Swiss-Prot record:
GO BP of this protein: proteolysis
Name of the protein: Vacuolar membrane protease
Glycosylation sites: 49, 96, 837, 853
Keywords: Glycoprotein, Hydrolase, Membrane, Metal-binding, Metalloprotease, Protease, Transmembrane, Transmembrane helix, Vacuole, Zinc
Cofactor binding notes: Binds 2 Zn(2+) ions per subunit.
Location of this chain's protein in the cell: Vacuole membrane
Entries under PANTHER family matching the protein: METALLOPEPTIDASE M28 FAMILY MEMBER, VACUOLAR MEMBRANE PROTEASE
Ranges per topology, Vacuolar: 32-349, 424-437, 490-499, 672-693, 743-995
Alphabetized GO MF terms: metal ion binding; metalloexopeptidase activity
CDD domains: M28_Fxna_like
Upper classification of the organism: Eukaryota, Fungi, Dikarya, Ascomycota, Pezizomycotina
Length: 995
């Protein structure tokens, strides 16, 4: 007989669950690790040239090109004439901004902050839309017409057949990497008020798929939804909104400050190559380039094709000073296998969540009530009486068996998995940096095996047919409690990242509904108890018959003779249907007749023997069985599975498969995609000083969610899979504990800076990172051999240490990269690199003039905060980024667009009593300490002065020999190390001043 392939037995459960997990996880991993293949043709979309775009990327990454480098200028001026239609190019060499530099953490009250002055060099390309006004409707300052020199996205829209419905502005942003300076400078450009939506192409990694990092609302996300290969989830958007991700992109300025609506499309891995010498075309792929380009073209086309009022009209927040681009709505979105894209409104999910919260418990309670009325609610029943008599003995039902197994198993297995995360953090915290799949495999195998062992062991000791339904009840309770928090977050915080829990609770409800409906197939509890009592009585009867001689009291009364007497016979006075029954009151000594036998007596002709008595007892059993079957419809030929409760034989054996389909595939897909995306995003952030525990906790929680759909069925999984996973756990645990965490493919990033004292010519080379690995880097450098290496905290990056040594063997030649510069002047000292002239312009006011050689960036650091700041040439303080702080500013970052140009900054400060003085000294007050002796008896009142330091940055390392310490590092550090800059400059030159 062929067994049901979907029955709830060990072999089918093991097969279907294992196949389902493998069929889902393998393609998800492949999609996560790969990129869509690049088209073989040169122009896969008419108007694009993938080959030319790849060559442009190769040119762009041929050298280091930060804002403060000569190669940046070279790239800005390069281009070729490839457009079919003229475009308007705004070569912005006039916009500048002075603003407050906010941080990801709100500053404490009365804490001095940081300000910046930046001169932009953005290039904006305006592509006229079909519905745009004709003519030059903008302010024509800084416009160069018909410079057709942009490629990629710009080239596509400049073709006549691809002209957008509404105009598009393509901004080639310069100065983004250091502090989003280019986007801030856009705020001063005349085109900015006309920009309603944006698509920001970003890079937080060096390849892979371009992820939809975050979006402002549902409507702009809909423009991305039809992309050929969508990739991303709303979780990233909410993580930014809640402050879990502190790094910023241009999105932060365009949306938060200017009020524009749009999207962030970004490369986000591998993080280890980001901002290193491997952040180039060689370590990228055409597939990555095509993935971003195709998504960009589709999204920009959809945004510019909206001719309605979706992105036009009054703002819903009523904010003044921001573009009027309509009323957005919050959205929830995620991709499926890199091909499908799900998008719906947050308010819709809130309504759905509220419905699930309220309706599902009521439905389940109603179903439970119906089961109770039908006397088939075996859950939570310990015993049942076979009758209504008080003296009836209650029979055990076993309805509580399996109730407490799931929470115990979940706590133990979850604790072991999270404990493994803490173990990794303690013993080998960076192993996830290069071996994230080994860590994930360890956690999956640990949770699976430990959870299975507890559930299988409990079911072996006390088999229960209610095991599955109890697990689903627990899942429903936990999911319902989680959904309460999710619903509050949806309504109050406008967060949609918890969509997975809404889907999970909905599927758990449907699965539990089916599980409760299964109970209708069971016999009534009272009927089952009556049957059990009858069977027990029969067993007791047979036990007595087999082990003791028959007595008259044990022998059932004889069955009446059914033979009828034919009419006209001797006993013809009886009807044919009337049995001949012996009258027990008759006299046994009746007078004999001539018919009386010679031997024997006048006994009843119906004789009782052992055989007839046995046949009569069997007949009684069959009669009772038929009566039980007729009363409930449940036969006696459905045996329970193994040693489960006797009443459970009628439970359907195939419904588990339907429940698994509801619980498994969709939840597994969402959990796997989300866990991989989050682990990919954070597993290499430990080198930046971020939490080393967080990646492991994310992996552990992702594993728990991934395997949770298996919980109701895991006790029927055979031992083969768990034992194999136990071996996997042992192997991966040993590897994760002892393996070296870095490799040439996943290099540890150390942060380099060389600090030069421009007054004493002393210089120190510093590497920032985790001390254990930084010391290994320093030990590999010839210039550090035999020198004292000081490692201490206080790094600009939290959680890292700074290891420094004397850089006398590798002095920088900071003018070598300049036009006509040779760097020979540095042999005589560094004093000529920066000239500072600080002079008083008032009692508490001063003018600081700075001239620096071969750099565009110099910073001011004051010992006490300044209450006023004005930079010559500035367009004024931009209050869109925050008002000037009452506590003042202690740091000012100054950026020029041209080399060797003078900065002039006027500053004011407050006296000891906290009042700013005017230009007249008569309004000042002084304490005794402000008097100093100028002669024998002459005293003069002196106002408080201002001390500070000018720090200039050099970032151009394209010419070998400019920064020998960096050249040495790139040549001699181990293959598992990548060197990148600590902050804005590779070399920092410091000069003090006082007024």
């Amino acid at each position: 007989m062929v067994k049901n392939p979907f029955s709830f037995r060990s072999a089918p459960v093991t097969f279907w669950t294992t196949v389902t997990y493998l069929a889902l996880l393998i393609p998800i991993i492949i999609i996560n690790e790969g990129t869509p293949p690049a088209p073989s043709e040169e122009s896969p979309i008419r108007g694009t040239n993938l080959t030319q775009a790849w060559l442009d990327l190769s040119t762009l990454t041929r050298g280091y090109h930060p804002y403060n480098s000569h190669y940046n200028d070279d790239l800005r001026g390069s281009g070729s004439d490839n457009s079919e239609a003229a475009v308007t190019v705004f070569d912005d060499l006039s916009s500048n901004c002075t603003f407050l530099m906010s941080s990801g953490v709100a500053p404490a009250p009365n804490t001095p902050q940081v300000a910046a002055y930046f001169e932009g060099t953005n290039i904006l390309v305006y592509i006229r839309g079909k519905s745009d006004d004709q003519g030059r409707w903008w302010d024509t300052a800084a416009v160069h017409d018909s410079k057709q020199n942009e490629k990629g996205l710009t080239l596509y829209f400049t073709r006549s057949e691809n002209q957008p419905e509404r105009g598009i502005v393509v901004m080639l942003n310069n100065g983004e990497e250091d502090y989003l300076y280019g986007a801030r400078a856009l705020g001063q450009h005349p085109l900015n008020p006309y920009i309603h939506t944006f698509l920001n192409l970003e890079g937080a990694g060096a390849g892979g798929r371009a992820i939809l990092f975050r979006t402002t609302d549902r409507e702009v996300t809909a423009a991305y939804a039809g992309s050929p290969d969508p990739f991303g989830t709303v979780i990233g958007s909410d993580a930014f909104g809640l402050g879990f991700i502190r790094s910023g992109t241009d999105y932060s300025v365009l949306y938060d400050v200017f009020g524009q609506r749009g999207l962030d499309l970004a490369f986000f891995k591998p993080r280890a190559r980001y901002h290193t010498d491997q952040d180039d075309a060689r370590h990228a792929s055409k597939g990555s380039l095509w993935h971003m380009l195709s998504a960009s073209i589709h999204t920009a086309t959809r945004l510019s094709s909206d001719t309605g009022d979706t992105f036009i009209g009054p703002r819903s927040d009523g904010a003044s000073g921001k573009v009027h681009n309509g009323s957005p709505s919050d959205g929830v979105w995620f991709d499926l296998f890199g091909k499908g894209f799900v998008l719906f409104g947050l308010r819709g999910m809130f309504a759905w969540s509220l419905t699930v919260l309220i309706a599902t418990p009521l439905i389940l309670m109603l179903l439970s009530y119906l089961l109770h009325r039908a006397d088939k609610y075996y859950l939570f029943s310990s015993s049942v009486k076979p009758g209504d008599q008080p003296d009836d003995e209650a029979l055990p039902v076993g309805g509580w068996k399996g109730f407490f197994r799931f929470p115990f198993a979940l706590v133990v297995a979850g604790s072991l998995t999270i404990g493994a995360a803490f173990l990794m953090r303690k013993v080998n915290p960076f192993i996830i940096y290069s071996s994230r799949y080994s860590v994930l495999a360890m956690m999956v195998s640990l949770f699976y095996f430990s959870f299975w062992a507890i559930m299988r062991g409990a079911n072996f000791a006390r088999p229960s047919a209610l095991h599955r339904v109890y697990v689903q009840i627990w899942l429903f309770i936990l999911g319902w409690a989680m959904l309460v928090a999710v619903t509050v977050a949806e309504d109050r915080l406008r967060i949609g990242a918890e969509y997975m829990f809404v889907f999970l609770e909905s599927s758990v409800f449907l699965s539990l509904f089916i599980a409760l409906c299964e109970l209708f197939a069971l016999p009534k509890k009272n009927a089952w108890a009556q049957k059990m009592r009858d069977e027990q009585e029969e067993r007791d009867f047979h036990r007595g018959r087999l082990h003791s001689p028959l007595s008259s009291s044990q022998i059932p009364p004889p069955v009446p003779n059914q033979e009828s007497t034919p009419p006209g016979t001797r006993h013809s006075n009886h009807t044919a249907s009337t049995p001949t029954i012996r009258n027990e009151d008759e006299d046994d000594d009746a007078a004999p007749t001539e018919r009386t036998p010679l031997v024997g007596g006048n006994a009843d002709p119906t004789r009782t023997t052992f055989a007839t008595t046995y046949r009569r007892s069997i007949s009684a059993l069959v009669t009772r069985a038929r009566r039980y079957s007729d009363s409930d419809g449940a036969g006696l030929h459905h045996d329970p599975f193994e040693r489960e409760q006797a009443w459970s034989g009628r439970l359907p054996s195939w419904t588990w498969f339907l429940q698994f389909l509801l619980l498994g595939p969709f939840t597994i897909t969402l959990a796997a995609q989300t866990a991989l995306m989050l682990v990919d995003a954070v597993h290499q952030t430990g080198a930046d000083g971020s939490s080393l525990l967080m990646p492991y906790l994310i992996a552990a929680l992702g594993v728990v969610l991934l395997l949770l759909p298996l919980a109701p069925f895991v006790h029927r999984v055979s031992h083969h899979v768990p034992v194999f996973l136990a071996a996997v756990f042992a192997a991966t645990l040993v590897y994760n504990l002892v393996a070296f965490p870095f490799s040439a493919a996943a290099r540890y990033k150390v942060y380099f800076v060389q600090a030069v004292d421009l007054e004493t010519d002393a210089n120190r080379v510093c590497y920032h990172g985790v001390e254990e690995y930084v010391r290994a880097v320093v030990d590999s450098l010839p210039s550090a051999s035999g020198r004292d290496v000081d490692c201490a905290g206080g790094s600009k990056k939290a959680g890292l240490v700074s290891c420094c040594f004397d850089g006398v063997a590798t002095p920088p030649r900071l003018t070598a990269g300049a036009s006509g510069g040779s760097g020979k002047h540095e042999e005589e000292g560094y004093g000529h690199l920066v000239a500072v002239n600080a002079s008083r312009t008032g009692e508490h006011a001063a003018r600081i003039e700075i001239v620096a050689n071969n750099t565009k960036a110099c910073f001011l650091e004051f010992e006490k905060p300044v209450s006023g700041l004005s930079v010559h040439g500035s367009s004024g303080w931009d209050e869109r980024f925050g008002q000037y702080p009452d506590a003042g500013v202690k740091n000012v970052r100054l950026w020029h667009r041209r080399w060797d140009e003078k900065w002039v900054a006027d500053v004011q400060w407050k006296d000891a009593e906290g009042e700013a003085a005017s230009s007249s000294s008569s309004s000042s007050s002084f304490s005794d300490g402000d008097w100093e002796v100028l002669g024998d008896e002459d005293l003069r009142k002196r106002a408080e002065g201002l001390k500070g330091t000018v720090v200039c940055m050099w970032s151009d390392a394209n010419v070998p020999g400019t920064i020998p310490a960096l050249d040495e590092a790139l040549r001699f550090v181990p293959a598992w190390v990548a060197v990148t800059k600590l902050s804005e400059g590779l070399v920092e030159g410091r000069r003090r001043f006082e007024v």
